[in-house]
Amino acid sequence: MKLADLAHLLGAECHGKPDSEITGVAGIEEAGPGHVTFVANPKYAGLARKTKAGAVLVAPSFPEIEAPTLRIKNPYLAFARAIEIFYPAPSYPSGIHPTAAIDPTARIGEGASIGAYVVVGENCVIGDHATILPHVVIYPNVQVGDYFFAHAHAVVREACRLGDHVILQNGVVVGSDGYGFAKDDAGKWHKIVQSGPAIIEDYVEIQANSCIDRASVGETRIGRGAKIDNLVQVGHGSSVGENTLLCAQVGLAGSTHIGDDAVLAGQVGVAGHCHISDRVIVTAQSGVGGNIEAGKIISGSPAYDNRQWLRVCAIMPRLPELLKQFERKRKTANE
């Protein structure tokens, strides 16, 4: 593909060598003459000046470099679109594989693709153009929307509802039983029936081996456009707001409520019944034990204001020496 044609597809402004051939994408340090790459952060301008790439996606204000540039407001998003251009997703033929077990009461939408050994239970509704890959199991009374995509070995439990353009990666379980038990007078634990479904709204993606538990009563809900990374646990009766990000190994205890546009970085843990408001950022490995106001950035365990936490981190390596100084001064004062 000529660079000028790629620029047109991306809506970018081409600077230099419009007739050069672009054959793929690569990171800025690995890119060669046939690759397009990107720089979204000005601090990497040095790498852009050294790159051997055939073209670099940059912001309009980015300084001139030797390599040809494609100038666009959001270089990172444009790079993502370039990947789609050069490496289109595989397509799957519509129809039902002969080994799939589809209950006669299930309704399968137009253009849906049902792979080998898929199980679809009674009274399920599968949306138009859904793609369900081998060994996916969908329990009875489930509804999934149009363009739903489930990778191999995903499971959707009974009565859950998933919207349009939802993606489940391999090994995801939606609607597994919440962790609920009641102790009797003899000290024995009794399972609490988890009666409420998990609801997954439109354009949610849940990545590999994550679990969204069903609720004991009520529902567990993942809001429109939320993105959930690998190995995430969402406890029963919790809610996750629209466009919120839960990074790898986040754990939400039951009845946790996360607002819109929040970010919980890797290995964040949240205690039950906490409310984390809109636009909150919780940095990696933090432990949240209380409610968090909108727009806050918090860190640590227990989590508190990020700026204060950074100051504490800066002091920590000096504590042994500060303690020695304190002990010397106290000894001097007592003499």
What does each model-found stretch correspond to?
Residues 1-99, 111, 160, 165, ...:
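Terminal amphipathic alpha-helical/low-complexity segments used for targeting or macromolecular assembly
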